[in-house]
Amino acid sequence: MAASCGSSQLPAAEPPLKIPKMEVLSPGSPGALSDGNPSLSDPSTPSGASPLGPGPAAGGAGLGGGGAAGGRGGASPSVSFSPGGAAAAAAAAACRGMSWTPAETNALIAVWGNERLVEARYQQLEGAGTVFGSKAPGPAMYERVSRALAELGYERTPSQCRERIKTLRRCYSRVKEHGVGKRKSSYTFEQLEQVFGQGGWDSQPCQPVLINSSGLYQELESDGSTMEEYSQEDWGNHSQDLHCYQTGEQELDEMPTTKRTLKIKQESSEDAQKRDVMQNIMQILESVQLKWELFQSWTDFSRLHLSNKLAIFGIGYNTRWKEDIRYHYAEISSQVPLGKRLREYFNSEKPEGRVIMTRVQKMNWKNVYYKFLEITISEARCLELHMEIDWIPIAHSKPTGGNVVQYLLPGGIPKSPGLYAIGYEECHEKPRSPLAEPRGADPSNETPGELEVPSPQASLRVEMESARIIYCYLGIAEVRTLQQCLFLHFQANTKTFSKEWVGINAFLSQNCVVEPGVSPKSIYIKFVEVERDFLSAGSLVECLEKAIGYPLKFNN
């Protein structure tokens, strides 16, 4: 058993108490991972002094309920004056268990960062690679950490250092993943990011910019005080509001306002994006003029032609007061067969079907309808290209003394078959003409300066409209790869032109010739990989034209 913190004074006649080897508390012990508890803190305890007596001990009583025996009491004379001062220090550490003061925790973070960097350099010298993570830290490293803490005035065993590092790594991982924790802490997220952010012994590039003890203590010691003089409350003033997870039974605090606001904004942005996608799908369904079919029974979805088809489908409804059918939901079923997806929307055991059944039972809706348009795999990828793939701008360079611009294709274009699109940023050379018309139909009544100074609303409109990218070509990389096709478009000359590509190639080549002081049009590309066997199926150009709402200029 570890020495009790609250042991009563022993009779003077008894022989000196022998301190057995201390037992390190496991992480599952009550309070073992607590960061601090003001009721048990004693920040005034100087470094090298122990609450158990004048013998050498750890710097400061532990914060939190991590002590193996609970309260703090006077030490017996046998313990205080026994020749084994190191044993008394071990007893003090055992009494604190895994409870760490803010000063100890920050010192551990700094020392661990230094040791981690040294370990990585050793591995480089040994030829083990230039990354953290070639091997996990061993007992020797925790012994070095323990000795380094002792030099700073904090007596901690290698086992305690190992358990505390594991706790800090869990804190960092959970805060990194969830962005929220249980309580405030004396250390900042940036500290953990610099120490554990390189992957935590995973394969990541070696970054020598790590926290060190001198840099960590410099700001706190500049006012003449020492780390031990800071109480738990004072530490809160010198640290950020890091909410980290601990494995004790603690209440989950509310998410900080800034993080909560950021999460709300992120969710609202995602919801807006989903609404835009669904609106686009509804426009596609309306453009092909499909008829609504009334849902009557489960036999509607047992038909063979619904079983394994991909499709664009919509769910609609009407009410007793209005017979017009309105959309409830629309989706491109590009991964799951249409029959399976529709069954989910008409199965009361599924979340989607439960919503529909509830609204019908409560007479919010009168009837439920559905419509669908079968699509091929290549058409599904084409719609994915339009709705989910972002545009990539094409850079260009101008040779010295010439008026011909050269395109610079980005790296990472796949050497595989697929679909690609080329677009350009819409140029508005006359953005002010609609705003100038209300001033009067007679140009003589207008002064030249009036048309040259647009209003703030006009500037905003020009900025918003100029960001629109117009599709002009859809390419199918079936015989050649995506990389080869795009290279032929952007790097071709008159010798490599073909009749099939003369339209888009002529446009791109003409855009390379610019007048002095005039920039070429901004060109963009996007692409998606598709298996070669699927590219020949479907009407891809018409599919994309229906989705974007206008014809492709260079495909016709």
Swiss-Prot record:
This is Myb/SANT-like DNA-binding domain-containing protein 2. Residues 1-82, 431-458 are annotated as: Disordered. PANTHER family: MYB/SANT-LIKE DNA-BINDING DOMAIN-CONTAINING PROTEIN 2, MYB_SANT-LIKE DNA-BINDING DOMAIN-CONTAINING PROTEIN 2. Residues 56-74 have a biased composition (Gly residues). It comes from Gallus gallus (Chicken). Residues 99-169 form the Myb-like domain. Pfam families: Myb_DNA-bind_4. It comes from the Eukaryota. InterPro entries: MSANTD2, Myb_DNA-bind_4. Residues 1-10, 36-45 have a biased composition (Polar residues). Signal peptide: none annotated.
